[in-house]
């Protein structure tokens, strides 16, 4: 069974026991969270349920396995011949989740 969830403004296709990285979700390691914004749910051998915009009664349960930071992204601006240079770095904070269960009531 698979589902398409919405987390942090992005969409992720998840299966049971899959591990995904989403934008930071506050919580302690090992704590369980539930996603109720499920956009699509289905099985590979049967037709899928597509939400309008979400599937009612569908819940995805996940466990927080890690809190980490992504690689640094450099933003650099320059104007030629004017000695104007600006450099900024950014590291996005991420949460690693393990999908435990996908249910539809």
Curated annotation (Swiss-Prot):
Please give the SUPFAM superfamilies that the UniProt record associates with this protein.
L21p-like
Q: Which UniProt keywords apply?
A: Ribonucleoprotein, Ribosomal protein, RNA-binding, rRNA-binding
Statement: the UniProt record of this protein carries the keyword Transmembrane helix: no
Please give the biological process terms from Gene Ontology that the record holds.
Answer: translation
InterPro entries (alphabetical): bL21-like, bL21-like_sf, Ribosomal_bL21, Ribosomal_bL21_CS
| Molecular function GO labels | rRNA binding; structural constituent of ribosome
Q: Cite a GO CC annotation.
A: ribonucleoprotein complex
Pfam families, alphabetized: Ribosomal_L21p
Q: Does the keyword Hydrolase apply?
A: no
Q: Can you tell which superkingdom this protein's organism belongs to?
A: Bacteria
Family, as annotated: Belongs to the bacterial ribosomal protein bL21 family.
Q: What does this protein do?
A: This protein binds to 23S rRNA in the presence of protein L20.
Record-linked PANTHER family: 50S RIBOSOMAL PROTEIN L21 (PTHR21349), LARGE RIBOSOMAL SUBUNIT PROTEIN BL21M (PTHR21349:SF0)
Please describe the quaternary structure of this protein.
Answer: Part of the 50S ribosomal subunit. Contacts protein L20.
The name on file for this protein is Large ribosomal subunit protein bL21
Organism for this UniProt entry: Rickettsia prowazekii (strain Madrid E)
């Amino acid at each position: 069974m698979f589902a398409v969830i919405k987390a942090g403004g992005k969409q992720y296709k998840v299966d049971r026991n899959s591990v995904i990285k989403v934008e930071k979700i506050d919580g302690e390691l090992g704590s369980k969270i539930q996603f109720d914004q499920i956009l699509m749910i289905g099985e590979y051998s049967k037709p899928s349920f597509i939400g309008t915009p979400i599937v009612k009664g569908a819940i995805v349960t996940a466990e927080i396995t890690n809190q980490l930071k992504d690689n640094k992204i450099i933003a650099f601006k320059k104007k030629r011949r004017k000695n104007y240079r600006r450099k900024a770095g950014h590291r996005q904070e991420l949460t690693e989740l393990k999908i435990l269960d996908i249910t539809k009531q």
